[in-house]
């Protein structure tokens, strides 16, 4: 079936994302071939399983996982039988949707993925013959007539090595094919989704009568990948999923189908246990401000939501598993996790859409650590410990589209938005203390500016307002904040900071100067750093401005670097080792514990605390997964 252009849903979504009218994009539907090449048919037979989309009697799409018997791919699984047709002989299990939806002459779509190499190919068409074995109801055979095929983008496939696993005992753990309005997904399934890095996305296009001849009805099956947890679940209703779209090949057939029929299926696989979660529901695409209300930090691509109306969860089903002793290699193109607005525990505050801040000062502490000060013309509300979200589009411009970028894969989803913890703030001003990231686009630009001024116009460092560098202020985020004090009480805190992870604590210390609760703050801090001569002056400066009657502050400094002479007023104990179990065992762990630093540092501290009986749920953490 040669395509005649974009159908009504594809035209709608392309209009929403401003692809319409671009001559370089308008003809991309011609990339979709109407006939399956025999070589591609062989590729499908070499895949370990075939995700397909079918429809139930209500017209809802369901994703199915068709696998070879015993998990061994080859010609006995999928074979080419000529004239753009595939014969599939598959092992299935109780709960597999095709056992309910399978029939002759049904529409079908599939995607073959070779996970060790990230190759993939999409197919769609119809089923001319469907049979379920009489002697074994868990074997199905179908002949697919393929009239749409495209070798699609491999960018977000997480590489993994798979092996046959024939010793399976599939069991339907829970199933609800039709959810009532007040029902939600069980917590077990929500956690399963949040632990996944891959989803198989099924879609359906039901042609309006006036377009049926030109754009016939069809199904779609696609794959979406990202970091673990890239698909989020609303805890408000427990059944709405949010799938962010990333920079891709810009064909948008899956989103176009959703735009037309507002239905989709999500199918998740646990490659280590063989568990499979099948979801179907009502879907919609959100763009621009509508998307940002749900997921504030998502880039300019669409956000797709799925309101689940039915599900099946099967354990130990897939006769293929991730090869023992191998790790998943995440796609280098995957952007950082983006969370729902509701997940920020009510601590995300957005600003006006066009609010800007002015760069007013630069403090260079070393060649790679500096503080940048910004001023706002409108009042700011920032809780000590929160992070500022800035857009650097005005300074750097939008990143140009490229389909692939092997030398810098992260650049493809770079929306020029960055987040840093605020290190100082007042009603109209805030500061960001940061470390320059090697090859970092944004920190590179900021530090290049600072170093250039230091060389040629050092007097400008103390007042950069004349440069008129205005940045977009998106908002402030985070719940890593000081606890609310009870008037007249004593607040005991234990802070663990790794490197530049000291910045939220810097903000908290500076805020204590203004605390009028009458509380006594008793703070022990363990700081691990390679730059004590940079970080210590900033800490001692923050501590020195607080009246001694308010705060007791003790610092355990862990560093292998030489430490300068300290002020007599500073209570610092210097250790030439790393934060270890011995230190944790000898500190008062009844204090409220905060932890901020790079992942290895965070993991070391959490492991030490766990050995002392303090679980991760008792620790307030902040990482750098912005």
Show which residues each predicted segment covers.
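C-terminal edge-of-domain segments
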Residues: 1-48, 122-240, 257-261, 275-384, ...
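A short mixed-secondary-structure module that forms the rim of ligand-binding clefts
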Residues: 47-50, 60-118, 224-271
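Short conserved beta-strand and strand-loop elements enriched in small hydrophobics
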Residues: 52-54, 107-115, 201, 264-269, ...
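Classical protein tyrosine phosphatase
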Residues: 55, 60-62, 70-74, 98-100, ...
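Short, structured patches in soluble enzyme cores that scaffold and shape functional sites
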Residues: 90-92, 112-115, 125-129, 145-148, ...
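Extended C-terminal subregions enriched in glycine
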Residues: 243-248, 252-260, 265-280, 295-297, ...
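FNR/FR-type flavoprotein reductase catalytic core
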Residues: 244, 253, 276, 431, ...
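Ferredoxin-reductase
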Residues: 350-467, 527-531, 540-543, 558-562
């Amino acid at each position: 079936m040669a395509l005649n252009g974009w159908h009504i849903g594809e035209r709608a979504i392309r209009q929403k994302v401003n692809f319409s009218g671009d001559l370089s994009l308008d003809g991309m539907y011609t990339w979709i071939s109407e006939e399956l090449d025999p070589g591609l048919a062989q590729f499908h037979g070499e895949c370990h399983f075939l995700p397909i989309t079918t429809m139930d009697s209500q017209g809802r799409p369901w994703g199915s996982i068709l696998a070879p018997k015993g998990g061994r791919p080859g010609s006995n699984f999928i074979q080419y039988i000529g004239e753009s047709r595939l014969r599939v002989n598959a092992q299935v299990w109780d709960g597999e949707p095709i056992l309910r939806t399978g029939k002759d002459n049904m529409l079908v779509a599939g995607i073959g993925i070779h996970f060790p190499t990230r190759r993939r190919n999409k197919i769609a068409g119809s089923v001319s013959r469907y049979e379920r074995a009489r002697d074994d109801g868990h074997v199905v055979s179908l002949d697919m007539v393929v009239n749409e095929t495209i070798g699609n983008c491999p960018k977000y496939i997480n590489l993994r090595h798979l092996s046959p696993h024939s010793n399976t005992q599939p069991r339907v753990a829970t199933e609800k094919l039709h959810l009532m309005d007040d029902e939600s997904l069980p917590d077990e399934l929500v956690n399963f989704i949040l632990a996944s890095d891959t989803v198989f996305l099924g879609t359906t296009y039901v042609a309006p009568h006036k377009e049926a001849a030109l754009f016939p009805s069809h199904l779609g099956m696609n794959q979406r990948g990202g970091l673990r947890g890239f698909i989020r679940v609303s805890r408000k209703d427990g059944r709405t999923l949010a799938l962010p779209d990333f920079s891709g090949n810009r064909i948008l057939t899956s989103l176009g189908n959703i735009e037309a029929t507002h239905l989709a299926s999500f199918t998740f696989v646990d490659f280590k246990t063989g568990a499979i979660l099948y979801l179907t529901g009502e879907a919609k695409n959100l763009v621009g401000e509508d998307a940002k209300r749900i997921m504030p930090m998502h880039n300019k691509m669409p956000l797709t939501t799925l309101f689940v109306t039915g599900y099946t969860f099967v354990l130990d089903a897939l006769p293929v598993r991730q090869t023992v002793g191998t790790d998943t290699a995440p796609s280098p193109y995957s952007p950082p996790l983006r969370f729902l607005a509701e997940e920020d525990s009510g601590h995300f505050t957005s600003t006006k859409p066009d609010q800007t801040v002015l760069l007013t000062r630069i403090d260079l502490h070393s060649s790679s650590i500096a503080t940048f000060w910004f001023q706002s013309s409108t009042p700011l509300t920032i809780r000590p410990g929160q992070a500022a979200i800035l857009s650097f589009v005005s300074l750097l411009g939008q990143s140009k589209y490229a389909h692939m970028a092997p030398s810098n894969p992260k650049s493809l989803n770079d929306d020029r938005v960055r987040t840093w913890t605020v290190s100082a703030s007042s009603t109209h001003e805030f500061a960001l203390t940061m470390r320059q990231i090697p090859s970092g686009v944004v920190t590179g630009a900021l530090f290049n500016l600072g170093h250039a001024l230091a060389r040629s116009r050092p007097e400008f460092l103390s007042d950069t307002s004349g440069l008129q560098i205005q940045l977009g202020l998106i908002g402030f985020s985070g719940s890593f904040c000081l606890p609310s004090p009870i008037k007249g009480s004593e607040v005991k805190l234990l802070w663990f900071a790794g490197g530049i992870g000291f910045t939220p604590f810097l903000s908290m210390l500076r805020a204590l100067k203004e605390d009028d609760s009458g509380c006594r703050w008793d703070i022990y801090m363990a700081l691990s750093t390679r730059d004590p001569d940079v970080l210590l002056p900033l800490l001692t400066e923050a501590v020195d401005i607080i009246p001694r009657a308010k705060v007791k502050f003790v610092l355990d400094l862990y560093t292998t670097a030489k430490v300068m002479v300290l002020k007599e007023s500073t209570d610092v104990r210097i250790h030439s080792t790393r934060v270890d179990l011995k230190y944790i065992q000898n500190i008062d762990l009844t204090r409220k514990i905060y932890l901020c630093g790079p992942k290895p540092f965070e993991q070391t501290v959490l492991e030490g605390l766990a050995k002392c009986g303090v679980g991760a749920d008792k620790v307030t953490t902040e990482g750098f997964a912005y």
